[in-house]
Amino acid sequence: MAFTRSIALFAGLALAASSAQEATILGGYTQKNATSDDIELLTQATSSANMYNKNVDTRICLIAIENLETQTVAGTNYKFQVAGCPVETDDELGACDDRNCDYSSYNIVIFSQPWSDTIEVTSITPAEYQG
C-alpha cells in the first residue's frame, strides 16, 4: 500500500513538474511590462556608444518601446522591441530628435549585471514582423 502511494505521489509530482516547465521555459525569455527602471536602462545603454559591444554596428535613435522580454542568465538579458530610426553618428543615439523620421521596429538586447556594474548593448537587429 505504501508503495502504491509512493508511485502515485511520484506520478503527481512528475505531472506538476511537466506542467510548470510548459509555463516557463528555463533559460528562455519571459514577457515583461516595462518599468521606469527598464526604460532608464534602455535610455542609458543606447545613448552612449561606449556601452555598445564592438560587434554591434547598427545605430538607431529611439521613438517608442513596443515590447520587452527578459532572460535570466549570469545577469539579465533585456530584449526590447522598439520603434526607431537609423542614425549616421553616435551624437544622434538615444531618443530621436526628429520624431517624424522613417522608423522601423528593432530588437535591442542589453546585458545587465548590476553586481559588476556591467551594462552592454549586445545586439541591434531588425524585428521580425509578428502579424
From Swiss-Prot:
Gene Ontology, cellular component aspect: extracellular region
Broad class of the protein's primary localization: secreted
Residues with site note (Reactive site): G27
Induction behaviour: Expressed during infection of host plant and in germinating cysts.
MF annotations from Gene Ontology: cysteine-type endopeptidase inhibitor activity
Signal peptide: 1-20
Glycosylation sites: N33
Residue span of motif Secondary area of contact: 71-75
Cell compartment(s), UniProt: Secreted
Job of this protein: Secreted effector that interacts with and inhibits host apoplastic pathogenesis-related papain-like cysteine proteases. Inhibition of host proteases by a pathogen extracellular protease inhibitor forms a specific type of defense-counterdefense mechanism between plants and microbial pathogens.
Name this protein carries in UniProt: Cystatin-like cysteine protease inhibitor EPIC3
Organism (species): Phytophthora infestans (Potato late blight agent)
Gene that encodes it: EPIC3
